[in-house]
Amino acid sequence: MLLTRAGRLPAATERALRDLRPTRVYVLGGEQAVRSEVLARVGEILPGTGVERVGGENRYQVARKVAERFWSSSRGAWVASGRTFPDGLTGGAAAGRGGFPVLLTRSVAVAPDAGQALLELAPTRVTVVGGTSAVSGYVGLRFGALVGDA
């Protein structure tokens, strides 16, 4: 995963893309999060590389769309707070290593996009990342109930 600014590709990210020479680049986030100019710049520095946006109206929807784009089903899923990024970012590495999607939720209620993604993916296990101030115990229990692991 490489990071960018909303309206400009940082030099370090540009160097990493040149070094990695991927055949496909996925840009996560809607137009407000990552503007079209950034996608165009990726196309300029990597001619012939496919550049695809996976966007949505908000971060919760983007996480669901990423799960839909890359997983038709999954044995497990990881859930993190959509309000702060550290838990989702660090949990994402572990989830990715296991081949699991990361969904985002609200602290005190299951985000509808996360609940919908779980119904579609039909995992048998959900791992909640972060403490109860990030994702309440109640929300953790609701996720467990959604996958029959209550």
Model-derived regions: residue spans:
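Extracellular glycan-binding segments that recognize GlcNAc-based cell-wall polysaccharides
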Residues: 1-150
